Amino acid sequence: MGSESSGTAELPPLPQVGIGTDIHAFEDGRELWCAGLKWEGEGTGLAGHSDADVVAHAACNALFSAAGAGDLGQHFGTGRPEWSGASGVTLLAEAARIVRARGFRIGNVAVQVVGARPKIGKRRDEAEAVLSAAVGAPVSVSGATTDGLGFPGRGEGLMAVATALVVRGA
């Protein structure tokens, strides 16, 4: 067994992975924001304290999870009125800043949105560009339906699941 005094090099830090989810119900009278984009002509938006962007929120939760930095509610929850009505992109940029301030580099974030609408594929490139700019690292977005099963399949709301990879060190 080596030791630092014997000249053995210190191993590089291991990557850390986090998982995040977010779920919001549709609510009449709200604009639909999803994956950092406003979706015109999609009918109702999502209920929430902020813009209720499930993709951005799940990405925030994944980043916080990977860095051991709490969760979305802790940083931006309903008890924090300064975040009321905030855009998901703003929250995501702030989440990335918090993670970096804790000494982590962000490798990437992958998010899958689950629901019947909007159809992510037609605006995937645009969404990935907006979210990647907010994070300062690659963000990929995919969509899935539930073949009519559960609340997303019945058109009652949206759900998103995300993973994030971070590594300690500048």
UniProtKB/Swiss-Prot annotation:
GO terms for molecular function: 2-C-methyl-D-erythritol 2,4-cyclodiphosphate synthase activity; metal ion binding. The record marks H49, T145 as: Transition state stabilizer. It is an enzyme of class 4 (lyase). It catalyses: 4-CDP-2-C-methyl-D-erythritol 2-phosphate = 2-C-methyl-D-erythritol 2,4-cyclic diphosphate + CMP. It comes from Streptomyces coelicolor (strain ATCC BAA-471 / A3(2) / M145). Belongs to the IspF family. The gene is ispF. This is 2-C-methyl-D-erythritol 2,4-cyclodiphosphate synthase. Coiled coil: none annotated. Involved in the biosynthesis of isopentenyl diphosphate (IPP) and dimethylallyl diphosphate (DMAPP), two major building blocks of isoprenoid compounds. Catalyzes the conversion of 4-diphosphocytidyl-2-C-methyl-D-erythritol 2-phosphate (CDP-ME2P) to 2-C-methyl-D-erythritol 2,4-cyclodiphosphate (ME-CPP) with a corresponding release of cytidine 5-monophosphate (CMP).
